Amino acid sequence: MQISSSSSSNFFSSLYADEPALITLTIVVVVVVLLFKWWLHWKEQRLRLPPGSMGLPYIGETLRLYTENPNSFFATRQNKYGDIFKTHILGCPCVMISSPEAARMVLVSKAHLFKPTYPPSKERMIGPEALFFHQGPYHSTLKRLVQSSFMPSALRPTVSHIELLVLQTLSSWTSQKSINTLEYMKRYAFDVAIMSAFGDKEEPTTIDVIKLLYQRLERGYNSMPLDLPGTLFHKSMKARIELSEELRKVIEKRRENGREEGGLLGVLLGAKDQKRNGLSDSQIADNIIGVIFAATDTTASVLTWLLKYLHDHPNLLQEVSREQFSIRQKIKKENRRISWEDTRKMPLTTRVIQETLRAASVLSFTFREAVQDVEYDGYLIPKGWKVLPLFRRIHHSSEFFPDPEKFDPSRFEVAPKPYTYMPFGNGVHSCPGSELAKLEMLILLHHLTTSFRWEVIGDEEGIQYGPFPVPKKGLPIRVTPI
Protein backbone atom coordinates (compact mmCIF):
# COMPACT_ATOMS: atom_id res chain seq x y z
CA MET A 1 0.00 0.00 0.00
CA GLN A 2 1.35 3.40 -0.96
CA ILE A 3 0.66 6.79 0.53
CA SER A 4 0.61 9.67 -1.89
CA SER A 5 3.04 12.52 -1.33
CA SER A 6 0.16 14.92 -0.97
CA SER A 7 -1.45 12.80 1.76
CA SER A 8 1.86 12.51 3.60
CA SER A 9 2.39 16.22 3.38
CA ASN A 10 -1.11 16.92 4.74
CA PHE A 11 -0.57 14.51 7.66
CA PHE A 12 2.68 16.12 8.81
CA SER A 13 1.29 19.58 8.25
CA SER A 14 -1.65 18.72 10.53
CA LEU A 15 0.68 17.23 13.15
CA TYR A 16 2.91 20.28 13.21
CA ALA A 17 -0.13 22.52 13.33
CA ASP A 18 -1.25 20.75 16.54
CA GLU A 19 2.24 20.81 18.08
CA PRO A 20 1.64 23.88 20.31
CA ALA A 21 -1.52 22.28 21.70
CA LEU A 22 0.31 19.00 22.40
CA ILE A 23 3.16 20.82 24.10
CA THR A 24 0.71 22.80 26.20
CA LEU A 25 -1.20 19.64 27.15
CA THR A 26 2.03 17.88 28.09
CA ILE A 27 3.13 20.79 30.25
CA VAL A 28 -0.29 20.88 31.96
CA VAL A 29 -0.16 17.14 32.71
CA VAL A 30 3.38 17.39 34.09
CA VAL A 31 2.46 20.39 36.25
CA VAL A 32 -0.67 18.65 37.59
CA VAL A 33 1.34 15.52 38.46
CA LEU A 34 4.04 17.58 40.17
CA LEU A 35 1.44 19.62 42.05
CA PHE A 36 -0.32 16.44 43.17
CA LYS A 37 2.95 14.94 44.41
CA TRP A 38 3.79 18.19 46.17
CA TRP A 39 0.32 18.25 47.78
CA LEU A 40 0.72 14.67 49.02
CA HIS A 41 4.14 15.50 50.45
CA TRP A 42 2.79 18.70 52.03
CA LYS A 43 -0.17 16.85 53.53
CA GLU A 44 2.10 14.10 54.85
CA GLN A 45 4.35 16.71 56.45
CA ARG A 46 1.39 18.70 57.78
CA LEU A 47 -0.50 15.71 59.20
CA ARG A 48 2.06 14.59 61.69
CA LEU A 49 1.39 12.34 64.66
CA PRO A 50 0.35 14.08 67.87
CA PRO A 51 3.20 14.84 70.29
CA GLY A 52 3.83 12.51 73.22
CA SER A 53 5.87 9.59 74.50
CA MET A 54 5.43 5.94 73.56
CA GLY A 55 7.21 4.80 76.74
CA LEU A 56 9.04 1.48 76.97
CA PRO A 57 8.95 -1.11 74.15
CA TYR A 58 5.65 -3.05 74.17
CA ILE A 59 4.86 -2.04 77.78
CA GLY A 60 4.61 1.61 76.79
CA GLU A 61 3.18 3.67 79.64
CA THR A 62 0.70 1.04 80.87
CA LEU A 63 2.29 0.58 84.29
CA ARG A 64 2.38 4.31 84.92
CA LEU A 65 -1.28 4.74 83.95
CA TYR A 66 -2.52 1.97 86.24
CA THR A 67 -0.27 2.72 89.23
CA GLU A 68 -0.41 6.53 89.29
CA ASN A 69 -3.28 8.81 90.11
CA PRO A 70 -4.96 8.99 86.68
CA ASN A 71 -5.57 12.71 87.18
CA SER A 72 -1.81 13.24 87.56
CA PHE A 73 -1.00 10.94 84.62
CA PHE A 74 -3.38 12.75 82.27
CA ALA A 75 -2.67 16.26 83.60
CA THR A 76 1.11 15.93 83.26
CA ARG A 77 0.85 14.95 79.61
CA GLN A 78 -1.90 17.40 78.77
CA ASN A 79 0.11 20.28 80.27
CA LYS A 80 3.20 19.18 78.34
CA TYR A 81 1.70 18.26 74.96
CA GLY A 82 -1.75 19.86 74.78
CA ASP A 83 -5.28 18.48 74.40
CA ILE A 84 -4.22 15.71 72.02
CA PHE A 85 -1.19 13.49 72.59
CA LYS A 86 0.06 10.02 71.81
CA THR A 87 1.09 7.22 74.16
CA HIS A 88 1.28 3.42 74.29
CA ILE A 89 -1.16 1.51 76.55
CA LEU A 90 -1.84 -2.23 76.90
CA GLY A 91 0.37 -3.05 73.93
CA CYS A 92 -1.37 -0.58 71.61
CA PRO A 93 -0.42 2.83 70.22
CA CYS A 94 -2.99 5.35 71.45
CA VAL A 95 -4.09 8.93 70.97
CA MET A 96 -5.59 10.58 74.05
CA ILE A 97 -7.92 13.55 73.65
CA SER A 98 -9.00 15.89 76.42
CA SER A 99 -11.25 18.55 74.92
CA PRO A 100 -15.05 18.53 74.51
CA GLU A 101 -14.68 19.23 70.78
CA ALA A 102 -12.43 16.20 70.25
CA ALA A 103 -14.68 13.99 72.38
CA ARG A 104 -17.68 15.08 70.32
CA MET A 105 -15.81 14.23 67.12
CA VAL A 106 -14.92 10.71 68.28
CA LEU A 107 -18.18 9.85 70.03
CA VAL A 108 -20.81 11.70 68.00
CA SER A 109 -20.09 13.64 64.80
CA LYS A 110 -17.60 11.12 63.34
CA ALA A 111 -18.48 8.10 65.45
CA HIS A 112 -18.61 5.94 62.30
CA LEU A 113 -14.83 6.38 61.97
CA PHE A 114 -14.17 4.96 65.44
CA LYS A 115 -15.32 1.53 66.55
CA PRO A 116 -15.58 0.38 70.19
CA THR A 117 -12.73 -1.88 71.18
CA TYR A 118 -12.02 -4.13 74.15
CA PRO A 119 -9.32 -6.68 74.97
CA PRO A 120 -10.20 -10.09 73.41
CA SER A 121 -10.25 -11.69 76.87
CA LYS A 122 -13.03 -9.34 77.99
CA GLU A 123 -15.04 -10.18 74.90
CA ARG A 124 -14.67 -13.91 75.62
CA MET A 125 -15.77 -13.51 79.23
CA ILE A 126 -18.79 -11.30 78.64
CA GLY A 127 -19.76 -12.76 75.27
CA PRO A 128 -19.06 -11.66 71.67
CA GLU A 129 -22.72 -10.88 70.97
CA ALA A 130 -22.99 -8.25 73.75
CA LEU A 131 -24.08 -4.91 72.33
CA PHE A 132 -21.05 -2.86 73.40
CA PHE A 133 -18.73 -4.95 71.20
CA HIS A 134 -20.63 -3.91 68.06
CA GLN A 135 -21.64 -1.01 65.89
CA GLY A 136 -24.00 -0.60 62.96
CA PRO A 137 -27.51 -2.11 62.57
CA TYR A 138 -27.00 -4.96 65.07
CA HIS A 139 -25.83 -2.52 67.74
CA SER A 140 -28.66 -0.08 67.00
CA THR A 141 -31.29 -2.81 67.33
CA LEU A 142 -29.88 -4.14 70.58
CA LYS A 143 -29.45 -0.71 72.13
CA ARG A 144 -33.05 0.16 71.32
CA LEU A 145 -34.18 -3.04 73.05
CA VAL A 146 -31.99 -2.52 76.11
CA GLN A 147 -32.97 1.14 76.42
CA SER A 148 -36.64 0.20 76.32
CA SER A 149 -36.03 -1.73 79.56
CA PHE A 150 -34.69 1.39 81.27
CA MET A 151 -37.14 4.03 80.11
CA PRO A 152 -39.30 5.73 82.77
CA SER A 153 -42.31 3.62 81.81
CA ALA A 154 -40.27 0.44 82.42
CA LEU A 155 -38.55 1.73 85.57
CA ARG A 156 -41.70 2.87 87.39
CA PRO A 157 -42.79 -0.66 88.34
CA THR A 158 -39.27 -1.48 89.61
CA VAL A 159 -39.25 1.20 92.34
CA SER A 160 -40.88 -1.07 94.92
CA HIS A 161 -38.47 -3.90 94.07
CA ILE A 162 -35.44 -1.62 94.37
CA GLU A 163 -36.75 -0.26 97.67
CA LEU A 164 -37.04 -3.79 99.04
CA LEU A 165 -33.42 -4.47 98.05
CA VAL A 166 -32.37 -1.21 99.75
CA LEU A 167 -34.10 -2.16 103.00
CA GLN A 168 -32.53 -5.63 102.94
CA THR A 169 -29.11 -4.13 102.26
CA LEU A 170 -29.24 -1.51 105.01
CA SER A 171 -30.63 -3.90 107.62
CA SER A 172 -27.63 -6.18 107.05
CA TRP A 173 -25.24 -3.29 107.75
CA THR A 174 -26.41 -2.53 111.27
CA SER A 175 -25.80 -6.07 112.50
CA GLN A 176 -22.05 -5.68 111.95
CA LYS A 177 -19.39 -3.66 113.74
CA SER A 178 -18.14 -2.30 110.44
CA ILE A 179 -18.57 -2.87 106.73
CA ASN A 180 -16.52 -2.40 103.59
CA THR A 181 -18.72 0.07 101.74
CA LEU A 182 -17.53 -0.90 98.28
CA GLU A 183 -18.15 -4.62 98.80
CA TYR A 184 -21.66 -4.09 100.13
CA MET A 185 -22.48 -1.60 97.41
CA LYS A 186 -21.38 -4.22 94.87
CA ARG A 187 -23.84 -6.67 96.38
CA TYR A 188 -26.62 -4.11 96.24
CA ALA A 189 -25.88 -3.01 92.65
CA PHE A 190 -25.56 -6.64 91.59
CA ASP A 191 -28.96 -7.51 93.09
CA VAL A 192 -30.54 -4.54 91.29
CA ALA A 193 -28.92 -5.66 88.02
CA ILE A 194 -30.25 -9.21 88.47
CA MET A 195 -33.73 -7.88 89.20
CA SER A 196 -33.59 -5.65 86.11
CA ALA A 197 -32.41 -8.53 83.93
CA PHE A 198 -34.93 -11.16 85.03
CA GLY A 199 -37.77 -9.27 86.70
CA ASP A 200 -39.60 -11.24 89.36
CA LYS A 201 -40.56 -14.15 87.10
CA GLU A 202 -37.84 -16.65 87.99
CA GLU A 203 -37.62 -19.12 90.85
CA PRO A 204 -35.31 -17.92 93.67
CA THR A 205 -33.26 -21.12 93.38
CA THR A 206 -32.62 -20.42 89.69
CA ILE A 207 -31.56 -16.86 90.44
CA ASP A 208 -29.24 -18.09 93.21
CA VAL A 209 -27.46 -20.43 90.75
CA ILE A 210 -27.09 -17.61 88.20
CA LYS A 211 -25.70 -15.29 90.89
CA LEU A 212 -23.17 -17.88 92.03
CA LEU A 213 -21.94 -18.62 88.50
CA TYR A 214 -21.71 -14.94 87.60
CA GLN A 215 -19.69 -14.17 90.72
CA ARG A 216 -17.26 -16.98 89.83
CA LEU A 217 -16.99 -15.54 86.33
CA GLU A 218 -16.41 -12.00 87.60
CA ARG A 219 -13.48 -12.99 89.82
CA GLY A 220 -11.29 -13.46 86.77
CA TYR A 221 -12.34 -10.37 84.87
CA ASN A 222 -9.14 -8.46 85.63
CA SER A 223 -6.85 -11.51 85.71
CA MET A 224 -4.12 -12.36 83.22
CA PRO A 225 -5.82 -14.04 80.22
CA LEU A 226 -4.01 -17.37 80.58
CA ASP A 227 -6.53 -20.14 79.90
CA LEU A 228 -4.53 -22.85 81.67
CA PRO A 229 -5.85 -25.28 84.32
CA GLY A 230 -5.56 -23.75 87.76
CA THR A 231 -5.45 -20.12 86.63
CA LEU A 232 -8.13 -17.66 87.69
CA PHE A 233 -8.94 -16.93 84.06
CA HIS A 234 -9.48 -20.64 83.34
CA LYS A 235 -11.82 -20.99 86.32
CA SER A 236 -13.75 -17.94 85.17
CA MET A 237 -14.11 -19.26 81.63
CA LYS A 238 -15.36 -22.56 83.03
CA ALA A 239 -17.96 -20.63 85.05
CA ARG A 240 -18.85 -18.72 81.86
CA ILE A 241 -19.68 -21.99 80.08
CA GLU A 242 -21.84 -23.14 83.00
CA LEU A 243 -23.55 -19.74 83.19
CA SER A 244 -24.38 -19.85 79.47
CA GLU A 245 -25.93 -23.28 79.93
CA GLU A 246 -28.00 -22.10 82.91
CA LEU A 247 -29.22 -19.08 80.96
CA ARG A 248 -30.06 -21.32 78.00
CA LYS A 249 -32.31 -23.39 80.29
CA VAL A 250 -34.07 -20.25 81.54
CA ILE A 251 -34.54 -18.97 77.98
CA GLU A 252 -35.82 -22.34 76.77
CA LYS A 253 -38.25 -22.62 79.67
CA ARG A 254 -39.69 -19.16 79.03
CA ARG A 255 -40.07 -19.89 75.34
CA GLU A 256 -41.87 -23.19 76.04
CA ASN A 257 -44.20 -21.61 78.59
CA GLY A 258 -44.91 -18.65 76.37
CA ARG A 259 -43.84 -16.30 79.18
CA GLU A 260 -41.73 -13.69 77.48
CA GLU A 261 -42.46 -10.90 79.95
CA GLY A 262 -40.30 -9.85 82.87
CA GLY A 263 -37.14 -7.73 82.88
CA LEU A 264 -34.67 -7.28 80.08
CA LEU A 265 -34.84 -11.00 79.36
CA GLY A 266 -38.52 -10.65 78.51
CA VAL A 267 -37.78 -7.77 76.14
CA LEU A 268 -35.04 -9.71 74.35
CA LEU A 269 -37.20 -12.82 74.09
CA GLY A 270 -40.04 -10.86 72.54
CA ALA A 271 -37.87 -9.04 69.99
CA LYS A 272 -38.63 -9.79 66.33
CA ASP A 273 -37.17 -8.29 63.16
CA GLN A 274 -39.12 -7.49 59.98
CA LYS A 275 -38.97 -11.16 58.99
CA ARG A 276 -40.33 -12.19 62.40
CA ASN A 277 -36.98 -13.69 63.36
CA GLY A 278 -35.96 -13.42 67.00
CA LEU A 279 -32.62 -13.25 68.76
CA SER A 280 -30.66 -16.46 69.25
CA ASP A 281 -30.10 -17.95 72.71
CA SER A 282 -26.43 -16.93 72.63
CA GLN A 283 -27.29 -13.35 71.67
CA ILE A 284 -29.74 -13.12 74.56
CA ALA A 285 -27.34 -14.73 77.06
CA ASP A 286 -24.40 -12.51 76.08
CA ASN A 287 -26.47 -9.36 76.46
CA ILE A 288 -27.89 -10.41 79.82
CA ILE A 289 -24.34 -11.01 81.10
CA GLY A 290 -23.17 -7.74 79.53
CA VAL A 291 -25.87 -5.67 81.22
CA ILE A 292 -25.20 -7.26 84.62
CA PHE A 293 -21.50 -6.53 84.20
CA ALA A 294 -22.06 -2.91 83.15
CA ALA A 295 -24.54 -2.26 85.97
CA THR A 296 -22.48 -3.51 88.91
CA ASP A 297 -18.94 -2.23 89.53
CA THR A 298 -19.34 1.30 88.19
CA THR A 299 -22.57 1.91 90.14
CA ALA A 300 -21.06 0.44 93.31
CA SER A 301 -18.01 2.70 92.97
CA VAL A 302 -20.17 5.82 92.59
CA LEU A 303 -22.29 4.84 95.61
CA THR A 304 -19.12 4.43 97.68
CA TRP A 305 -17.99 7.92 96.70
CA LEU A 306 -21.43 9.31 97.54
CA LEU A 307 -21.09 8.15 101.13
CA LYS A 308 -17.53 9.48 101.27
CA TYR A 309 -18.43 12.95 99.99
CA LEU A 310 -21.52 13.28 102.19
CA HIS A 311 -19.53 12.17 105.24
CA ASP A 312 -16.82 14.74 104.47
CA HIS A 313 -19.37 17.55 104.02
CA PRO A 314 -21.65 17.40 107.09
CA ASN A 315 -23.52 20.60 106.22
CA LEU A 316 -24.40 19.20 102.83
CA LEU A 317 -25.44 15.90 104.42
CA GLN A 318 -27.75 17.84 106.72
CA GLU A 319 -29.38 19.59 103.76
CA VAL A 320 -29.84 16.31 101.88
CA SER A 321 -31.33 14.69 104.99
CA ARG A 322 -33.74 17.60 105.33
CA GLU A 323 -34.89 17.15 101.74
CA GLN A 324 -35.37 13.41 102.26
CA PHE A 325 -37.15 13.81 105.61
CA SER A 326 -39.68 16.08 103.92
CA ILE A 327 -40.43 13.36 101.38
CA ARG A 328 -40.53 10.68 104.07
CA GLN A 329 -43.10 12.63 106.11
CA LYS A 330 -45.33 12.90 103.06
CA ILE A 331 -44.99 9.16 102.41
CA LYS A 332 -45.88 8.33 106.01
CA LYS A 333 -48.83 10.68 106.00
CA GLU A 334 -50.21 8.97 102.89
CA ASN A 335 -49.38 5.51 104.29
CA ARG A 336 -47.52 4.29 101.22
CA ARG A 337 -44.09 3.36 99.89
CA ILE A 338 -41.70 5.56 97.97
CA SER A 339 -42.81 6.14 94.38
CA TRP A 340 -41.29 7.12 91.06
CA GLU A 341 -42.82 10.58 91.48
CA ASP A 342 -41.02 10.99 94.83
CA THR A 343 -37.66 10.39 93.17
CA ARG A 344 -38.41 13.20 90.71
CA LYS A 345 -38.72 15.64 93.65
CA MET A 346 -35.18 15.33 95.01
CA PRO A 347 -33.35 18.24 93.33
CA LEU A 348 -30.55 18.61 95.88
CA THR A 349 -29.93 14.86 96.15
CA THR A 350 -29.88 14.66 92.36
CA ARG A 351 -27.28 17.43 92.17
CA VAL A 352 -25.17 15.61 94.78
CA ILE A 353 -25.23 12.52 92.56
CA GLN A 354 -24.32 14.63 89.51
CA GLU A 355 -21.38 16.20 91.33
CA THR A 356 -20.22 12.82 92.60
CA LEU A 357 -20.24 11.49 89.05
CA ARG A 358 -18.13 14.48 87.98
CA ALA A 359 -15.72 14.59 90.92
CA ALA A 360 -15.10 10.84 91.11
CA SER A 361 -15.18 10.31 87.31
CA VAL A 362 -15.32 6.56 87.82
CA LEU A 363 -15.31 6.17 84.04
CA SER A 364 -11.99 7.96 83.44
CA PHE A 365 -11.92 7.25 79.70
CA THR A 366 -13.27 4.93 77.06
CA PHE A 367 -11.58 3.04 74.21
CA ARG A 368 -12.24 3.50 70.51
CA GLU A 369 -10.25 2.40 67.45
CA ALA A 370 -9.81 4.38 64.24
CA VAL A 371 -11.18 2.37 61.30
CA GLN A 372 -9.29 4.58 58.83
CA ASP A 373 -6.77 7.41 58.91
CA VAL A 374 -8.45 10.41 60.54
CA GLU A 375 -7.32 14.02 60.48
CA TYR A 376 -8.05 16.13 63.53
CA ASP A 377 -6.69 19.55 64.48
CA GLY A 378 -3.76 19.18 62.10
CA TYR A 379 -2.75 15.77 63.42
CA LEU A 380 -3.02 12.30 61.96
CA ILE A 381 -4.77 9.55 63.90
CA PRO A 382 -3.61 6.43 62.02
CA LYS A 383 -5.93 3.58 61.17
CA GLY A 384 -5.84 0.90 63.87
CA TRP A 385 -4.70 3.21 66.66
CA LYS A 386 -6.74 3.34 69.86
CA VAL A 387 -8.37 6.66 70.72
CA LEU A 388 -9.22 7.53 74.32
CA PRO A 389 -11.55 10.45 75.14
CA LEU A 390 -10.45 11.51 78.64
CA PHE A 391 -13.67 12.16 80.53
CA ARG A 392 -11.79 12.71 83.78
CA ARG A 393 -9.69 15.55 82.35
CA ILE A 394 -12.74 17.26 80.88
CA HIS A 395 -14.67 16.89 84.15
CA HIS A 396 -11.73 18.33 86.10
CA SER A 397 -11.03 21.25 83.80
CA SER A 398 -11.26 24.65 85.49
CA GLU A 399 -12.38 26.06 82.14
CA PHE A 400 -15.68 24.18 82.39
CA PHE A 401 -15.96 23.60 86.16
CA PRO A 402 -14.44 26.42 88.24
CA ASP A 403 -12.46 25.21 91.25
CA PRO A 404 -12.82 21.62 89.97
CA GLU A 405 -11.34 19.91 93.03
CA LYS A 406 -14.03 21.40 95.26
CA PHE A 407 -17.11 19.24 95.84
CA ASP A 408 -19.91 21.65 94.96
CA PRO A 409 -23.31 20.30 93.84
CA SER A 410 -24.60 23.85 93.31
CA ARG A 411 -22.62 24.00 90.06
CA PHE A 412 -25.36 21.80 88.56
CA GLU A 413 -28.06 24.39 89.21
CA VAL A 414 -27.09 25.44 85.68
CA ALA A 415 -26.73 22.78 83.01
CA PRO A 416 -23.11 22.15 81.94
CA LYS A 417 -22.00 23.12 78.45
CA PRO A 418 -22.46 20.37 75.82
CA TYR A 419 -19.84 17.61 75.90
CA THR A 420 -18.23 18.86 79.12
CA TYR A 421 -20.12 16.39 81.34
CA MET A 422 -20.16 12.77 80.18
CA PRO A 423 -20.28 10.42 83.19
CA PHE A 424 -22.14 7.81 81.13
CA GLY A 425 -20.27 8.42 77.89
CA ASN A 426 -21.95 10.03 74.89
CA GLY A 427 -23.24 9.24 71.44
CA VAL A 428 -24.50 5.91 70.13
CA HIS A 429 -22.42 3.95 72.64
CA SER A 430 -23.47 5.87 75.76
CA CYS A 431 -24.66 3.80 78.72
CA PRO A 432 -28.30 2.74 78.15
CA GLY A 433 -28.82 2.06 81.88
CA SER A 434 -27.93 5.49 83.25
CA GLU A 435 -31.46 6.18 84.51
CA LEU A 436 -31.56 2.89 86.41
CA ALA A 437 -28.24 3.73 88.07
CA LYS A 438 -29.48 7.15 89.21
CA LEU A 439 -32.77 5.66 90.43
CA GLU A 440 -31.10 3.05 92.65
CA MET A 441 -28.82 5.76 94.07
CA LEU A 442 -31.75 8.03 94.92
CA ILE A 443 -33.75 5.30 96.66
CA LEU A 444 -30.76 4.13 98.70
CA LEU A 445 -29.89 7.69 99.76
CA HIS A 446 -33.51 8.30 100.77
CA HIS A 447 -33.51 5.47 103.29
CA LEU A 448 -29.88 5.88 104.35
CA THR A 449 -30.16 9.58 105.21
CA THR A 450 -33.54 9.30 106.96
CA SER A 451 -32.94 6.15 109.01
CA PHE A 452 -29.19 5.80 109.58
CA ARG A 453 -25.96 7.57 110.38
CA TRP A 454 -22.51 6.42 109.33
CA GLU A 455 -18.97 7.23 110.29
CA VAL A 456 -15.77 6.42 108.45
CA ILE A 457 -13.43 4.12 110.36
CA GLY A 458 -9.77 5.12 110.34
CA ASP A 459 -8.22 8.25 108.95
CA GLU A 460 -6.53 6.85 105.86
CA GLU A 461 -7.16 9.10 102.89
CA GLY A 462 -6.41 8.39 99.28
CA ILE A 463 -7.64 6.49 96.27
CA GLN A 464 -7.08 2.94 95.09
CA TYR A 465 -7.40 1.91 91.45
CA GLY A 466 -8.53 -1.55 90.51
CA PRO A 467 -9.83 -0.90 87.88
CA PHE A 468 -12.13 1.94 88.96
CA PRO A 469 -11.02 4.69 91.37
CA VAL A 470 -12.53 4.21 94.85
CA PRO A 471 -11.64 5.40 98.37
CA LYS A 472 -8.83 3.40 99.94
CA LYS A 473 -9.74 0.04 101.48
CA GLY A 474 -13.24 0.35 100.03
CA LEU A 475 -14.24 2.98 102.65
CA PRO A 476 -14.73 1.07 105.94
CA ILE A 477 -17.71 2.55 107.83
CA ARG A 478 -19.81 1.91 110.90
CA VAL A 479 -23.59 2.28 110.44
CA THR A 480 -26.09 2.92 113.24
CA PRO A 481 -29.87 3.45 113.15
CA ILE A 482 -31.19 6.90 114.03
Swiss-Prot record:
This is Abscisic acid 8'-hydroxylase 2. The chain crosses the membrane at residues 20-40. InterPro entries: Cyt_P450, Cyt_P450_CS, Cyt_P450_E_grp-I, Cyt_P450_sf. One of its GO terms (biological process) is release of seed from dormancy. It comes from Arabidopsis thaliana (Mouse-ear cress). The keyword Heme applies. GO terms for molecular function: (+)-abscisic acid 8'-hydroxylase activity; heme binding; iron ion binding. It is found in: Membrane. Its cofactor is heme.
